[in-house]
């Protein structure tokens, strides 16, 4: 169906899950994959596989509210034939071959609040970044809506700011082939 002359193209549909409980790892996975593939139950099953004989599973919250660790994210991606590659913060971001990367998952310090009261504490929070129709988006589940970052320069600026704050870890979500060839890293 063609558009009327002068009509604005409709914005792309960007899948974005909002924060529930401590399920930011589940939300980050689904947001980076742009569809609901994982649930709390699926993440809990991965935890059981990672530590089958453990009474207190080290890969999630003791309260059963989520708060999954990086091993759950990596195992979830591996189950889909994908890989998570740690980005070495000492490398310049110009070496990141973004066209080879499906998306990014960041682990950031996040402020803690009780209602309107901000506490002087910080917890870890998983955030997804993904390109949709040529535009990179911040798909943080704590945001009301996806935040457009723009092109490759925009996402590099966002990453540089996050890494400059310290305590930020970056995972590149790539295909197995990209992981094996190391083509997520520019050689020029």
Swiss-Prot record:
Subcellular localization(s) per the UniProt record: Cytoplasm, Cytosol
GO molecular function, one term: cysteine-type deubiquitinase activity
Annotated Gene3D superfamilies: 3.90.70.40
InterPro entries for the chain: JOSD1/2 (IPR040053), Josephin (IPR006155)
GO cellular component, one term: cytosol
Keywords, sorted A to Z: Cytoplasm, Hydrolase, Protease, Ubl conjugation pathway
Primary location recorded for the protein, binned into one broad class: cytoplasm
Active site: 24, 125
EC number: 3.4.19.12
Catalysed reactions listed for this entry: Thiol-dependent hydrolysis of ester, thioester, amide, peptide and isopeptide bonds formed by the C-terminal Gly of ubiquitin (a 76-residue protein attached to proteins as an intracellular targeting signal)
Residues annotated as domain Josephin: 11-188
Keyword field contains NADP: no
Pfam families per record: Josephin
PROSITE patterns reported for this sequence: JOSEPHIN
GO biological processes: protein deubiquitination; proteolysis
PANTHER family reported for this sequence: JOSEPHIN 1, 2, JOSEPHIN-2
Role description: Cleaves 'Lys-63'-linked poly-ubiquitin chains, and with lesser efficiency 'Lys-48'-linked poly-ubiquitin chains (in vitro). May act as a deubiquitinating enzyme.
UniProt-recorded name of the protein: Josephin-2
Organism: Homo sapiens (Human)
């Amino acid at each position: 169906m063609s558009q009327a002359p002068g009509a604005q193209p409709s914005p792309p549909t960007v899948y974005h899950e909002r924060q529930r409980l401590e399920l930011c790892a589940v939300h980050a996975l689904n947001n980076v994959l742009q569809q609901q593939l994982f649930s709390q139950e699926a993440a809990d099953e991965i935890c059981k596989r990672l530590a089958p004989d453990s009474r207190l599973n080290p890969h999630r919250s003791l309260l059963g509210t989520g708060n999954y660790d990086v091993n759950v994210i990596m195992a979830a991606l591996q189950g889909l034939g994908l890989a998570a590659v740690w980005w070495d913060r000492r490398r310049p971001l110009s070496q990141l071959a973004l066209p080879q990367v499906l998306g990014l998952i960041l682990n950031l310090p996040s402020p803690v609040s009780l209602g309107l009261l901000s506490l002087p504490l910080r917890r870890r929070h998983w955030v997804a970044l993904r390109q949709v129709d040529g535009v990179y988006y911040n798909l943080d589940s704590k945001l009301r809506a996806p935040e457009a970052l723009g092109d490759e320069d925009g996402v590099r600026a966002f990453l540089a700011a996050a890494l400059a704050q310290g305590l930020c870890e970056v995972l590149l979500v790539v295909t197995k082939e990209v992981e094996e060839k190391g083509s997520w890293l520019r050689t020029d």
